């Protein structure tokens, strides 16, 4: 008998990335007197975040409590009002196994049901999607979603190795591939095919530092100048090579931190709180973990396109309706690719937004005006929740010195897990 033939499994069709909403056409939602009518089923009634730091001295219980306390006070509720909780982190960094049960007990959230969610860097935005679904199902009315991560207990080298496990540990990680190297592949492709330059990447970091300086909870609050990227200058600490073409200044700052988002169904939300921000649309997508299985590096991360298309369609809007956004800028190239995936710029033209400074606070589409992951910091499990907190505060007009002018009414959060393995896009409105 001959050897059995290998079955060929067709590659699944990608989520369409060219829906009208993504192209920035007209909003598809219903309107009354020219204003978009928003579907308001699930609201954010409370947000909280710890400071993002390196070398947090307390336990994960204490770290989680910082964000939880602020969110509960913000919502004006007590533990008795909460009927379920979702905890989120990247388990590679957790010494504590089954952290959801441990934290739920510490925060006074038992015997209510508690759940644990992980999707690497997008864990807490995935947790919000889970919490949203729990409420929409009718099973729960008020859900706490808490993301946390304590990353500074190990060396930077060990941290990179663990983060690399978020990619393919069988075919890629054993050969030394780590997160900077993966994103460097995208940056190389963008330079070769789209004319991206080192100055474009630097421009992203210059913007992030502009707002990191004024964000009291950011881990990196130093001003960054072009001279900091000067090659060959021993004083230019951000110019050191990491994975060509990415330099030290192109990489985000890992940190210890926590974030907390409290969700409620419409009926309960209107009773509990007067400062409501609604979830208008949620999109999520996934991609092959192995980089060799990806079809085209020149179009960036496919999950961004797919998740955005879903979220825009659900909200009945287009990219033109977004007034302020938080995107996943783990590396400078990641922010530029996010512009394109969200429809803020055509494929290959994200760099133009950097050159025109269109994503500054006073620009056409303000992005990451809290410093982003590059300056605010990236405690993996807490990142998505922190992004959501920023957008909620923006829509309430409570963002202080980071407030975008013009009273924004629709905001967006774009959160990526791994090297585009998971993608979440969530649209919020007043």
Where are these regions (language model features)?
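Conserved catalytic cysteine-centered active-site region
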Residues: 89-143, 150-182, 222-253, 285-287, ...
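Short Gly/Ser/Thr- and charged-rich N-terminal loops/segments
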Residues: 20-27, 31
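Short glycine/threonine-rich loop-to-helix capping motif typified by GTGT followed
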Residues: 93-102, 291-296, 329-352, 379, ...
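Beta-strand segments within the central parallel beta-sheet cores of soluble alpha/beta enzyme folds
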Residues: 44, 79-88, 113-119, 143-148, ...
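Conserved active-site "lid/cap" helical segment
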Residues: 34-122, 190-200, 207, 219-230, ...
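Active-site-proximal alpha-helical scaffold in enzymes
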Residues: 118-149, 181-215, 261-268, 379-399
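Condensing-enzyme catalytic core mediating Claisen C-C bond formation in acyl metabolism
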Residues: 34-61, 169, 173, 203, ...
């Amino acid at each position: 008998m001959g050897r059995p033939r290998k079955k060929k499994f067709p590659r699944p069709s990608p989520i369409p990335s060219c829906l009208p909403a993504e192209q920035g056409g007209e909003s598809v939602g219903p309107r009354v007197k020219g204003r978009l009518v928003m579907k308001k089923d699930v609201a954010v009634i409370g947000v909280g975040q710890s400071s993002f730091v390196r070398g947090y001295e307390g336990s994960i219980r204490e770290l989680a409590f910082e964000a939880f306390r602020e969110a509960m006070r913000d919502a004006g509720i007590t533990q008795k009002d909460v009927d379920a909780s979702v905890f989120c982190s990247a388990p590679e960094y957790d010494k504590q196994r089954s952290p959801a049960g441990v934290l739920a007990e510490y925060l006074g959230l038992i015997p209510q049901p508690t759940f644990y969610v992980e999707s690497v860097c997008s864990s807490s935005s995935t947790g919000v999607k889970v919490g949203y679904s729990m409420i929409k199902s009718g099973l729960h009315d008020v859900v706490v979603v808490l993301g946390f991560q304590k990353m500074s207990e190990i060396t930077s080298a060990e941290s990179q190795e663990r983060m690399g496990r978020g990619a393919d540990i069988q075919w890629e990680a054993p050969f030394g591939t780590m997160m900077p190297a993966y994103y460097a592949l995208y940056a190389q492709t963008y330079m070769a095919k789209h004319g991206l330059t080192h100055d474009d990447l630097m421009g992203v970091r210059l913007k992030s530092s502009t707002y990191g300086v004024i964000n009291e909870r950011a881990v990196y609050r130093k001003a960054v100048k072009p001279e900091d990227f000067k090659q060959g200058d021993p004083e230019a600490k951000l110019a050191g090579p990491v994975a060509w073409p990415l330099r030290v200044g192109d990489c985000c700052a890992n940190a210890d931190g926590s974030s907390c988002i409290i969700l409620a169904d419409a009926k309960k939300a209107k009773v509990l709180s007067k400062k409501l921000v609604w979830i208008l649309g949620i999109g999520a997508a996934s991609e092959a973990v192995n980089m060799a299985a990806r079809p085209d590096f020149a179009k960036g991360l496919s999950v961004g396109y797919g998740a955005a298309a879903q979220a825009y369609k659900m909200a009945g809007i287009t990219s033109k309706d977004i007034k302020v956004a938080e995107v996943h800028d783990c590396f400078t190239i990641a922010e530029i690719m996010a512009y394109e995936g969200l429809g803020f710029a055509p494929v290959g033209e994200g760099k133009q937004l950097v050159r025109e400074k269109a994503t500054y606070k006073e620009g056409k589409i303000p992005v990451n005006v809290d410093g982003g992951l590059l300056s605010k910091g990236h405690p993996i499990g807490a990142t998505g929740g922190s992004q959501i907190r920023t957008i909620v505060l923006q829509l309430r007009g409570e963002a202080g010195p980071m407030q975008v002018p013009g009273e924004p009414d629709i905001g967006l959060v774009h959160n990526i897990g791994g090297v585009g393995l998971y993608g979440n896009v969530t649209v919020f409105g007043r």
